[in-house]
Regions:
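Phosphate/nucleotide-donor binding subsite
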Residues: 45-89
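Short, well-ordered, mixed-charge alpha-helical segments that flank or form enzyme active sites
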Residues: 61, 100-104, 110, 129, ...
């Protein structure tokens, strides 16, 4: 279990989740079993409410993601993605290395056919009480215009399916609203998105 304040923050979050969800699903925790059990005990939560898979390695934030994913095969991220690839779990989340999570999503699980690159998204509130979905928030340093345009399609589908927004409006977040502003990638992505009939 990587990430800031690991494993305490992740285990406490898992306890909150299992309290909210109940027996509807089973949460599997990957990491140092002794440390996980110590946090569960401190939280007055019975360890038998979870499945715990002991791992001995951690992909550190400074590790090269692809190399670490290949070399640290007993890390929580690699083992977790292995469980996901084998169908032993239905979903996998980690607060650890973002780069290793991207490598895992591309190598262990495989993206949906046609998806060029995965993206990280977040939902933020609007001043009117609605929600806005932001994509590409911390994974990619540079994106080709085609990838940014595809993120528009992915975001539109996600907003409809997960946020219940019937006809989401898609835009490129840029340094100004004028079409002539921004870097070359943003302007080219805008042109591709403007011509697309895949989204609003």
């Amino acid at each position: 279990m990587g990430g800031d304040f690991a494993p305490e923050a992740a285990v406490k979050g898992a306890v909150m989740a299992v309290d909210a969800i109940g027996d509807e699903c089973r949460i599997v925790l990957f990491g140092d079993e002794d440390r996980i059990r110590a946090v569960l005990k401190a939280e007055n939560c019975a360890a038998d409410r979870f499945d715990i898979v002991h791992t001995t390695e951690v992909i550190e934030m400074g590790d090269h993601p692809a190399k670490a994913f290949q070399q640290k095969t007993n890390s929580s991220i690699v083992v977790g993605f292995g469980y996901l690839a084998k169908g032993l779990i239905n979903g996998f989340a980690s607060a650890g290395s973002t780069g290793a999570m991207m490598v895992g999503s591309m190598q262990a699980v495989k993206p949906i056919e046609g998806v060029i690159r995965p993206t990280i998204s977040t939902v933020a509130p609007t001043v009117t009480g609605g929600k806005v979905l932001l994509l590409d928030v911390g994974l990619n340093v540079d994106c080709k215009p085609e990838v940014l345009a595809q993120y528009g399609i992915i975001g539109s589908i996600y907003a409809q399916a997960m946020l219940g927004i019937r006809n989401p409006r898609v835009a490129v977040l840029n340094i100004g609203e004028e079409e002539t502003k921004g870097n070359a990638q943003s302007k080219a992505a805008y042109e591709l998105m403007k011509e697309s009939e895949e989204f609003n």
